[in-house]
């Protein structure tokens, strides 16, 4: 029995180091290769020993797919390919290919050059890793080999994020990565067709959350920022370089312009320029409004937002600073936080999810005394606000995507166990779909029913539609046609088209049944009695008496004959084509009951 096996190496009942191993019809695919921001030891990387105990990883894995450039999805890639050892293809979209190495190098500098961490990848390893990348376009079907194919769908979330369909023959798995089902100020909503995979592997970060109105959240965010700078405080907004950063920059830029505010807004040095460059380069990945107005005005060229210099953090007076990274686990955002945390006038606004172990997660959990490096205790007096501008789907969005794709089963990753359990029950009860939520290292095995895909000719479909017999997804029905196999592909076509394509002449096949009648009259008289009887019974059918004495009802032919062994009885031969099988069977049953008594 064919089966699909799924083992999370990371992000199983957890958020961070996303890495899922999928085996489908003898092919092995690794989905994402992320890093956990809450750890500084070997636990930051997925446990690759689950992949295979014997031989090279390249011999076992057919390919690696990266959904987007966030480090919890791609951060372990150079470690995996260059230090663990993998030489096979790595698939990702063009924007991910462009941005991924920049973020990897930024993080490497923080981890190695500033913190002095060992057993970490080098700049050269990042370059060597990226040489193995094969970039894909949206909706492009890519043949990994003769049997395995992949296809990318738009995921929203961040520039270049994609959901991937992995297909081998008639079996398929869809992996969502991170996605957003609602459009925002710079990206569109995630979209996938009704692909009906055997399994949908979906993120579940906000498995129990139904978000409030986006407009209310934006108004609340602007109000809090404005109130803080009005009283002379500083606002720190930790963000990742691309994604929510651009969303909130557009929002503040518009507000500052409208209110004619002069308080400075800063963004981490260098990242605005890089972001601007990539949004220009990959403008087709943005939403419709930005694509339309891009020629007249680039929404990412900000008038009020300037590059940040480290010395600005000590400047007196109010300011707003966007600093990376978004979870306060390292880098410039953490440095600024340490400087500003002791002043109650200041505010830190966390606009996205923070994994356990990060400073961001600790302050959102209510901790106000933090043990930093060197056992130094930092007292947090500044105001802490969490405002979800996260580009992840909420519970409603996840249910919407499951309904859209119509999978046979669902598997939840990238979420917290308790929240996953709630969503699992919701999916099973409301959508009647089996749902799984394996922990890291746990394997889920799903049996699949072998099926053969059959293409249907346009002519046959048009004929069915003209008869008002279009099949429905929920109520399947039979289509009659001729099955043709060519180059291992099956097609259902009309019999006329099949004869034409195969160069064959039509031969009519008829079925004949003998019905015995007790009648001593001549054959012609018997046939006339049969005609009169059927004419009176079958008022909605075309019943004819032909010159040769035979009777027809539609395509059914009836002929009376005297059997040689008993001239006193007659045999009625009833013959029909397979199209009129129901009518032929009905007439046979009717005539077996006998003819009405003739008047004397």
Swiss-Prot record:
Record-listed cross-link Glycyl lysine isopeptide (Lys-Gly) (interchain with G-Cter in SUMO), residues: 381, 462, 475
Keywords, in A-Z order: Cytoplasm, Hydrolase, Intellectual disability, Isopeptide bond, Metal-binding, Nucleus, Ubl conjugation, Zinc
Effect after changing residue 217 to W: In NEDMLOB; uncertain significance
Activity control, per UniProt: The RNA endonuclease activity is inhibited by BRAT1 that forms hyrogen bond and hydrophobic interactions with the active site.
Binding site for Zn(2+) 1: 68, 70, 157, 178
Primary location group: nucleus
GO cellular component: blood microparticle; cytoplasm; cytosol; INTAC complex; integrator complex; nucleoplasm; nucleus
PTM description: Sumoylated; sumoylation regulates its subcellular location and is required for integrator complex integrity.
Effect ascribed to mutating residue 396 to E: In NEDMLOB; uncertain significance; may affect function; the orthologous mutation in Ints11-deficient Drosophila is unable to rescue locomotor defects
Residues annotated as catalytic: 203
Self-association state and partner proteins as the record states: Component of the Integrator complex, composed of core subunits INTS1, INTS2, INTS3, INTS4, INTS5, INTS6, INTS7, INTS8, INTS9/RC74, INTS10, INTS11/CPSF3L, INTS12, INTS13, INTS14 and INTS15. The core complex associates with protein phosphatase 2A subunits PPP2CA and PPP2R1A, to form the Integrator-PP2A (INTAC) complex. INTS11 is part of the RNA endonuclease subcomplex, composed of INTS4, INTS9, INTS11 and inositol hexakisphosphate (InsP6). Interacts with WDR73; interaction is required for the assembly of the RNA endonuclease subcomplex in the cytoplasm.
Protein name: Integrator complex subunit 11
Source species: Homo sapiens
Gene that produces this protein: INTS11
């Amino acid at each position: 029995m064919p089966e699909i096996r799924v083992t999370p190496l990371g992000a199983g009942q957890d958020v961070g180091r996303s890495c899922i191993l999928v085996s489908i019809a003898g092919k092995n695919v690794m989905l994402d290769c992320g890093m956990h921001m809450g750890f500084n030891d070997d636990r930051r990387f997925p446990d690759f020993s689950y992949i295979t105990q014997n031989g090279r990883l390249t011999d076992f894995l057919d390919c690696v797919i990266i959904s987007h450039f966030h480090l919890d999805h791609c951060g372990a890639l150079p470690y995996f390919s260059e230090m663990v050892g993998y030489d096979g293809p790595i698939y990702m979209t063009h924007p991910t290919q462009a941005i991924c190495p920049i973020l990897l190098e930024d993080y490497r500098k923080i981890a190695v050059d500033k913190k002095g961490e060992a057993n970490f990848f080098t700049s050269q390893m990042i370059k060597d890793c990226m040489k193995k990348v094969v970039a894909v376009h949206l909706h492009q079907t890519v043949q990994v080999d003769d049997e395995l194919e992949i296809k990318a769908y738009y995921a929203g979330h961040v520039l270049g994020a994609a959901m991937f369909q992995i297909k081998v023959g008639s079996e398929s798995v869809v992996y969502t990565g991170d996605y957003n089902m609602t459009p925002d100020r710079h990206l569109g909503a995630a979209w996938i067709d009704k692909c009906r995979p055997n399994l949908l592997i979906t993120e579940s970060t906000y498995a129990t959350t139904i978000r409030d109105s986006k407009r209310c959240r934006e108004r609340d965010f602007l109000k809090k920022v404005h109130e803080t700078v009005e009283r002379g405080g500083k606002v720190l907004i930790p963000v990742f370089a691309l994604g929510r950063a651009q969303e909130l920059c557009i929002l503040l830029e518009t507000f500052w312009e409208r209110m004619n505010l002069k308080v400075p807004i800063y963004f981490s040095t260098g990242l605005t320029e890089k972001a601007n460059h990539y949004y220009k380069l990959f403008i087709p990945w943005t939403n419709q409004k930005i694509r339309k107005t891009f020629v007249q005005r680039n929404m990412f060229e900000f008038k009020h937002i300037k590059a940040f210099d480290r010395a600005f953090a000590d400047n007196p007076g109010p300011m707003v600073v966007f600093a990376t990274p978004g979870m306060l686990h390292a880098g410039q955002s953490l440095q600024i936080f340490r400087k500003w945390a002791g002043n109650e006038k200041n505010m830190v606004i966390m606009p996205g999810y923070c994994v356990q172990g990060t400073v961001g997660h600790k302050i959102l959990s209510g901790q106000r005394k933090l043990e930093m490096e060197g056992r130094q205790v930092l007292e947090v007096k500044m105001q802490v606000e969490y405002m979800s501008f996260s580009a992840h789907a909420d519970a409603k969005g996840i249910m919407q995507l499951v309904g859209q794709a119509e999978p046979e089963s669902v598997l939840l990753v990238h979420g917290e166990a308790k929240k996953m359990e709630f969503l699992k029950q919701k999916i099973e009860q409301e959508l009647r779909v089996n749902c799984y939520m394996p922990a890291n290292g746990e394997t889920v095995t799903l049996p699949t029913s072998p099926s053969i895909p059959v293409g249907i000719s346009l002519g046959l479909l048009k004929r069915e539609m003209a008869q008002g017999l279009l099949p429905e997804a929920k109520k399947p029905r039979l289509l009659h046609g001729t099955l043709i196999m060519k180059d291992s592909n099956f097609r259902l076509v009309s019999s006329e088209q099949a004869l034409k394509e195969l160069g064959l002449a039509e031969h009519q096949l008829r079925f004949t049944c003998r019905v015995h009648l007790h009648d001593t009259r001549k054959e012609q008289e018997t046939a006339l009695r049969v005609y009169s009887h059927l004419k009176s019974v079958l008022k909605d059918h075309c019943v004819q008496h032909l010159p040769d004495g035979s009777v027809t009802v539609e395509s059914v032919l009836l002929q009376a004959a005297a059997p040689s062994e008993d001239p006193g009885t007659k045999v009625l031969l009833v013959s029909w084509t397979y199209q009129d099988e129901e009518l032929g069977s009905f007439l046979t049953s009717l005539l077996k009951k006998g003819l009405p008594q003739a008047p004397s």
